[in-house]
């Protein structure tokens, strides 16, 4: 199924975890201190943003969702500032304020878009345990479509199993962003989202995707977790579910500017998508797009619905048009990874007419992506005789690629497209005319792979041969 934006405004997501306040001091630097070999920064702007679980909730709100946030803070001004930032962004805050403790604060000094130093202000929350959040957490489960556990190993989620058990009792899926090397503490979770370094710290180095999948499946079974989504930086992300085919998505970032908080964006988009009823692979595809957007921003940041919509449009348009066969196979694999159904047809398409256009629109309606395989000039000549084609293959393909219904056009040189159809193995193979499905080139390969073959009607009164005859019989002017 083609990926579309779900009704995010209907998604209620409960986020629980470690809360922190991110502060940014921006300034210019053009000299070295006489006191020590360090740059002198002239601070011109001070910025504050929610971090940790707060950034996850902020990402949910930026998508239009309804986040409920539970976590531990101190009884201090930083907690007040954090609550104000979040509530102004549409996040409902349910803080457990611990007397005598300080809210975790991280200060970053930035000049010319480069982070010069980070200062952490934190003493932890001695004696804190995840079960301490249950009084705020449990009443919020009713009506939530997903739970996110955002673990930064600061104490709020020390032994998160009581929170997972409460959510599962309420029938709410649980997504956890893990920390540490013991993933068994997330037993019962629907999904955990380690990055590659965190994953390999537990299972060892994975030299290839097959190893990653094999070890991921074993880890999921061992820890009692339904699925793992391993984020792999520039290599994209991989979804591993025991007993199901893995899903690998390529990274979508055009330029990586700052990876701070990218994991928060991924899990927030996943949870918000799942809370609207999206299947996990579809939510994963949206999360992959969101990650590609957010790493192009500085610091902990969010992704808007408008940005996601634009990224979806760009993704749909990218790679469209005339492709070589290797390029086509790569595009098909990527489309399938995003849950899209592939339709394929073929023909000479020498003189494009209204019948062709109507036929291709019918074909496109059978799935999400339409491939048109086009006979090259020598192939047309063998089939139609001397004098054909009227238009060379590059022109025929260019015209087809300009149609809104057509995604990809590929040439073939054989008398039939059986070989290229067998390489693509479309979900739906279509042909126009009065053929029997079994007589269609590529039928056996498509059906054997679980696809189907469909015969479509041509538009009456439209024929390339008739057009040629009319042109030949027309009086000279």
Curated annotation (Swiss-Prot):
The active site is at 264. GO terms for biological process: ADP-L-glycero-beta-D-manno-heptose biosynthetic process. In the N-terminal section; belongs to the carbohydrate kinase PfkB family. In the C-terminal section; belongs to the cytidylyltransferase family. It holds the Pfam family PfkB. Homodimer. This is Bifunctional protein HldE. The gene is hldE. InterPro entries: Bifunc_HldE, Carboh/pur_kinase_PfkB_CS, Cyt_trans-like, PfkB_dom, RfaE_dom_I, RfaE_dom_II, Ribokinase-like, Rossmann-like_a/b/a_fold. CDD domains: RfaE_like (cd01172). GO terms for molecular function: ATP binding; heptose 7-phosphate kinase activity; heptose-1-phosphate adenylyltransferase activity; phosphotransferase activity, alcohol group as acceptor.
């Amino acid at each position: 199924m083609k990926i579309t934006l779900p009704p995010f405004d209907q998604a209620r997501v409960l986020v629980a975890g470690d809360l922190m306040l991110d502060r940014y001091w921006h300034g210019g630097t053009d000299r070295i201190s006489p006191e020590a070999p360090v740059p002198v920064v002239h601070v011109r702007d001070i910025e504050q943003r929610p971090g940790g679980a707060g950034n996850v909730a902020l990402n949910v709100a930026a998508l239009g969702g309804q986040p409920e946030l539970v976590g531990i803070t101190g009884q201090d001004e930083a907690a007040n500032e954090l609550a104000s930032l979040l509530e102004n962004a549409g996040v409902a805050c349910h803080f457990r304020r611990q007397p005598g403790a300080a809210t975790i604060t991280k200060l970053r000094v930035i000049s010319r878009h480069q982070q010069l130093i980070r200062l952490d202000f934190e003493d932890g929350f001695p004696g804190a345990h995840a079960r301490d959040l249950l009084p705020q957490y449990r009443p919020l489960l009713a009506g939530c479509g997903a739970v996110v556990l955002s673990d930064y190993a600061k104490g709020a989620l020390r032994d998160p199993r009581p929170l997972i058990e409460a959510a599962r009792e309420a029938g709410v899926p649980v997504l956890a962003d893990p920390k540490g090397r013991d993933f068994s503490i997330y037993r019962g979770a629907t999904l955990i989202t380690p990055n590659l370094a965190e994953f390999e710290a537990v299972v060892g180095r994975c030299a290839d995707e097959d190893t990653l999948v094999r070890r991921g499946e074993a880890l999921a079974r061992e820890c009692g977790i339904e699925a793992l989504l391993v984020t792999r930086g520039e290599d994209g992300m991989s979804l591993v579910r025991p007993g199901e085919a893995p899903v690998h998505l390529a990274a979508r970032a055009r330029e990586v500017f700052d990876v701070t908080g990218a994991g928060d964006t991924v899990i927030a988009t996943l949870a918000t998508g799942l809370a609207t009823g999206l299947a996990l692979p579809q939510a994963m595809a949206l999360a992959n797009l969101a990650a590609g957007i957010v790493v192009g921003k500085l610091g902990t940041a969010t992704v808007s619905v408008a940005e996601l919509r634009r990224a979806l449009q760009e993704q749909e348009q990218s790679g469209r048009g005339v492709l070589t066969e290797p390029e086509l196979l790569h595009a098909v694999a990527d489309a399938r990874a995003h849950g899209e159904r592939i339709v394929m047809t073929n023909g000479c398409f020498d003189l494009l007419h209204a019948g062709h256009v109507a036929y291709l629109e019918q074909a496109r309606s059978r799935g999400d992506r339409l491939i048109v395989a086009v006979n090259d000039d020598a192939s047309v000549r063998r089939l139609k005789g001397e004098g054909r084609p009227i238009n060379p293959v590059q022109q025929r393909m260019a015209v087809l690629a300009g149609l809104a219904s057509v995604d990809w056009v590929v040439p073939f040189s054989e008398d039939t497209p059986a070989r290229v159809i067998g390489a693509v193995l479309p979900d739906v193979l279509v042909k126009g005319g009065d053929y029997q499905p079994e007589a269609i080139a590529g039928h056996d390969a498509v059906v054997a792979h679980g696809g189907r073959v469909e015969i479509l009607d041509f538009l009456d009164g439209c024929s390339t041969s008739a057009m040629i005859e009319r042109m030949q019989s027309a009086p000279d002017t």
